[in-house]
Amino acid sequence: MSITSLLQQTTLLPEHYRALSITEMESRILSIKKKLGSKLFIPGHHYQKDEVIQFADATGDSLQLAQLSAANKEAEHIVFCGVHFMAETADMLTSKRQHVYLPDMRAGCSMADMADIYQTEQAWPILQQLFGDTITPLTYVNSTAAIKAFTGRHGGACVTSSNAKELVQWAFTQKQRIFFLPDQHLGRNTAYDLGVPLENMAVWNPHKNILETKQPIENIQVILWKGHCSVHEGFTVQHTETVRKEYPSMRIIVHPECSREVVDAADDAGSTKYIIDTINQAPSGSAWAIGTEMNLVNRIIKQHPDKQIISLNENFCPCLTMNRIDLPHLLWCLESIDHGQPHNRIQVDDHTSKEALSSLERMLARR
């Protein structure tokens, strides 16, 4: 869905919600949760702030939460505290009787938006002309339903940061090359870890409609869409050097959405779940610098007072679009459902959903 069409269907939060006290909003949210009971399910992504996550019935990554939503057959109303592409995935995986809502329709994802379906459809025939029928597309689940549908239509699969290696390996058994979108860093880091040389990777620039490479075309194994996560691209090698200087014994762990240079400079890299599990299992007194979203890092710090934990970039701000989900929007969304006039329902059309689900199903078949 384009930004323009998204804004056209957005109903703005009534101003009186912003005037409410935190105590009153929390009380009214709890009241509706109690009233609706099992008919309501609130999944909350790891990157949500604490004021929202306290009301989540489950926390996790985007795919995990979408699957939990689908498995919760009693829930008629799923209020997804995350961003737009996550709610889309939940809508596609849930049944027709289950309705998915996003408290603030402006909660998008800059990385997902970097892979526009129109640009992707323009790129594909050019890549086919360059490489022939030798490419399997892979899309990160952090992508729009339209991009997932494109991937499914062309025989590809979705990936998560946890299973990207397995899916890249699978894709190479299908065809000679992969087309990875929208996050170039996850694609590059994953392929490199599997032994693909950096010089055998090229970047597709959707703004210029060109393949950026200095290598002969026949050497290219991985085509990376020129997209990135604005949060994780904010971590730099300089940040790792500062930590090494100020905290020599501190281990650095980062998300693979960070650049190759940062991953190389870190001690470890892995998915959100991997980071959480690693810190959970670390001995008391251990020291960590974490390169991922600030709300999650702050939550990990609170959960582990026995460990020294900092953000790799302590001056960094949380994900701005995730932070659009707040108490006023959550309360407004819940009360609109309770009053029988729900706002901000997420609906993916049947044709897009069918093709997108094929890419998700290929991924799930590999797990």
From Swiss-Prot:
Gene3D superfamilies: NadA-like. Pathway: Cofactor biosynthesis; NAD(+) biosynthesis; quinolinate from iminoaspartate: step 1/1. NCBIfam families: nadA, PRK09375.2-1, PRK09375.2-4. It catalyses: iminosuccinate + dihydroxyacetone phosphate = quinolinate + phosphate + 2 H2O + H(+). It is an enzyme of class 2 (transferase). The keyword Thylakoid does not apply. Iminosuccinate binds at residues 45, 62, 140-142, 161, 255-257, 272. HAMAP family: NadA_type3. Binds 1 [4Fe-4S] cluster per subunit. It comes from the Bacteria. GO terms for molecular function: 4 iron, 4 sulfur cluster binding; metal ion binding; quinolinate synthetase A activity. Belongs to the quinolinate synthase family. Type 3 subfamily. PANTHER family: QUINOLINATE SYNTHASE, CHLOROPLASTIC, QUINOLINATE SYNTHETASE A. GO terms for cellular component: cytosol. Catalyzes the condensation of iminoaspartate with dihydroxyacetone phosphate to form quinolinate. [4Fe-4S] cluster binds at residues 109, 229, 319. GO terms for biological process: 'de novo' NAD biosynthetic process from L-aspartate. Its cofactor is [4Fe-4S] cluster. It is found in: Cytoplasm. This is Quinolinate synthase. Keywords: 4Fe-4S, Cytoplasm, Iron, Iron-sulfur, Metal-binding, Pyridine nucleotide biosynthesis, Transferase. Coiled coil: none annotated. Its EC number is 2.5.1.72.
